[in-house]
């Protein structure tokens, strides 16, 4: 039966220390090779925490599955800031354009439950609320209503889902 190790690691910077090394050591795989493969697969997410699943089969072969970073991490990267607001609702730390929100929604396409770009955009907007991030200089909840009303339809027609 295969063993599975799941961890949240910095993109492109996995190392043999915790959390991966101690979990992989008892499984008898070459930790150095596994770390190199993980770093190769996660290099595009440099500076972000990335969920990684390492599946070690009985014959010691290894499969690596890389998820996408949390939506909040993608929002922070898009805004080039370190962290969200500690006082959401009163302190605004950044503003996203609707095209940036659509870009994040497309990046999360495989991980979210939405069937349409509009629904995915509304999910991303929902993550912006507690982070203190506005969209088109509006509260994200107002933007969600605007998406429902079709106010961004022209902007989103060029966006592929």
Curated annotation (Swiss-Prot):
Q: Could you name the Gene Ontology cellular component terms for this entry?
A: large ribosomal subunit
Please name every pair of cysteines joined by a disulfide bond in this record. Answer: none
Q: What are the GO BP annotations of this UniProt entry?
A: translation
GO molecular function ontology, one term from the record: large ribosomal subunit rRNA binding
Record keywords, A-Z: Ribonucleoprotein, Ribosomal protein, RNA-binding, rRNA-binding
InterPro entries linked? Ribosomal_uL11, Ribosomal_uL11_C, Ribosomal_uL11_C_sf, Ribosomal_uL11_N, Ribosomal_uL11_N_sf
Q: What Pfam families is this protein classified in?
A: Ribosomal_L11, Ribosomal_L11_N
Q: Which HAMAP family match?
A: Ribosomal_uL11
> What is the purpose of this protein?
Forms part of the ribosomal stalk which helps the ribosome interact with GTP-bound translation factors.
What family does the database annotate?
Answer: Belongs to the universal ribosomal protein uL11 family.
Q: How does it assemble?
A: Part of the ribosomal stalk of the 50S ribosomal subunit. Interacts with L10 and the large rRNA to form the base of the stalk. L10 forms an elongated spine to which L12 dimers bind in a sequential fashion forming a multimeric L10(L12)X complex.
- The identity of this protein, by name, is Large ribosomal subunit protein uL11
Lineage here is: Archaea, Methanobacteriati, Methanobacteriota, Stenosarchaea group, Methanomicrobia
